[in-house]
Amino acid sequence: MAKYLINARVEVDGVVEKHDIIGAIFGQTEGLFGEQFDLRTLQDKNRIGRIQVMTKIHNGKTIGELIIPSNLDRLETALVAAMIESVDRVGPYSARIEVVDIIDVRLEKIKKIIDRAIEILHEWSKEKAPDIKEILKEMQEALKVPEPQKYGPEQLPAGPGVDESDTIIIVEGRADVINLLRYGFTNVIALGGARKVPNTIKNLAKKKKVIVFLDGDHGGDLILKELLRTIKVDFIARAPEGREVEELTGKEIREALSKAVPTREYLEKLAKQGNKEAQYLLQVQERLAREVAEQIKPQVKVEEKKPVEKPVPKPPKTVEEVVEAVSIPLRIREDIKSLYGTLEAILYDNEWNSVKRLPVRDLVNTLDELDENNVQAIVMDGIITQRLIDKASEKKVKMIIAAKIGRINYKPPEILILTFNDIM
């Protein structure tokens, strides 16, 4: 963009063309101040731009306007303007050129910027200033404890996060729900005082990881036994002995949930102490886990020794999905045991070497950062979701082994999905 625009008026005592005027300017200024300041040389070096000529014929004369862009400094631009004024003939006719103005393009641009800034400032000042009352009201709403909702056909007291979360916390009554909501636990639902486990709870337990959080008294023991006989329970948390969930502080709630024990571990400990009912409940829980896992039941072989490669027969032509047999090293079972209750995942390469161990909540984002084919398998103490399957398919993951399988709308045929119960 040029720094200056030389604006001049031209008058010729005869009828001439535009190129005649331009030729006269170049011809009559050539060599006046040496080759370095010749107009053609300056134009070749982009120091001045193309000369624009606008003319019209009036009473046998040619009159018009010249515009010459200049990238020279102020002194040199003024000299070029004076050189142009020195032209006194165009062809056989007398001519007069007079510089009318030299426009500083940068100043014009600055002026436009200032004008626009003033306009923006006026528009900005018209906007409504923030109302402190509205701000305080928004802050108050943010701190407001959400009210329990009525969930399912049985109208069970529940928090607003039950549907969105992949884990639910089952408590006894409405007061327990209110107390957990007060401290930010929104994925909580109550049994609602029912003698039997409501169907809503049964259905949720088939799709989500379940944490049972009950009072530390005999009543809590009875409710826990009923739940263990009816639904798949993943973790068991209890209030301190003699205390109720509804009276716990936020710190006590977090501490109790952080100490939640995997159901298998809880029952095995009681069974070792000779508790026959615990042995029975352990068998019930294993059966319930298998029933949930049968949503997707592939063939799997856990190898006791180093696998020997065998030719894989071509799959039969059928509309049904065919899942091929897969060899999993025995040590992966130890990795699964180490994952129980941690809510963590381990990524493996094609040789079943551990690539990374990370929290389940970071799994999708971590996969997103990895290149394709970097991860062959994922073992995770969590629930397999459609979002995870979609990302795993994108990254060419071949296998996912998890504690539980959530609601899946589509499973790519190239991904094998297993639960811990399939392996253990």
Swiss-Prot record:
Mg(2+) 1 binds at residues 172, 215. Its cofactor is Mg(2+). It is an enzyme of class 2 (transferase). Coiled coil: none annotated. PROSITE patterns: TOPRIM. Its EC number is 2.7.7.101. Mg(2+) 2 binds at residues 215, 217. It catalyses: ssDNA + n NTP = ssDNA/pppN(pN)n-1 hybrid + (n-1) diphosphate. This is DNA primase DnaG. It comes from Staphylothermus marinus (strain ATCC 43588 / DSM 3639 / JCM 9404 / F1).
